[in-house]
Amino acid sequence: MSLLTEVETPTRNEWECRCSDSSDPLVVAASIIGILHLILWILDRLFFKCIYRRLKYGLKRGPSTEGVPESMREEYRQEQQSAVDVDDGHFVNIELE
C-alpha cells in the first residue's frame, strides 16, 4: 500500500460515518423541519388565494345586520344586487368597509 492510500482511507470513512449517522438528534430534527417546511410551502403555493383571503377578511361574510329593521336589510340587499348586476358580461368586485 502506498502512503497516500493509507492516509486517504480513514479520512473518507470518517466523513461517511458522520454523514450517515441518522441517530443524531440534531440530524433527525433538521430532517423533520425540512420536510415540514417543504409540505407547508407546497400547501401555501396551492392554496395561497384562499389562505390570504381568509386572513384579510376573516371568517365574516358581510356586515352584521343585528338590530337593523327588515326593510333596511331588504333595501341593502337590493342595492348590492343591482351593483353586481350592472353589466351581465363583467364581474364587479365590491369591498365593504
Curated annotation (Swiss-Prot):
InterPro entries: Flu_M2. This is Matrix protein 2. Residues 1-22 are virion surface. It comes from Influenza A virus (strain A/Chicken/Hong Kong/YU22/2002 H5N1 genotype Z). Its main location: virion. The record marks 41 as: Seems to be involved in pH gating. It is a single-pass type III membrane protein. It comes from the Viruses. Residues 60-83 are annotated as: Disordered. It is found in: Virion membrane; Host apical cell membrane. Cytoplasmic tail plays an important role in virion assembly and morphogenesis.
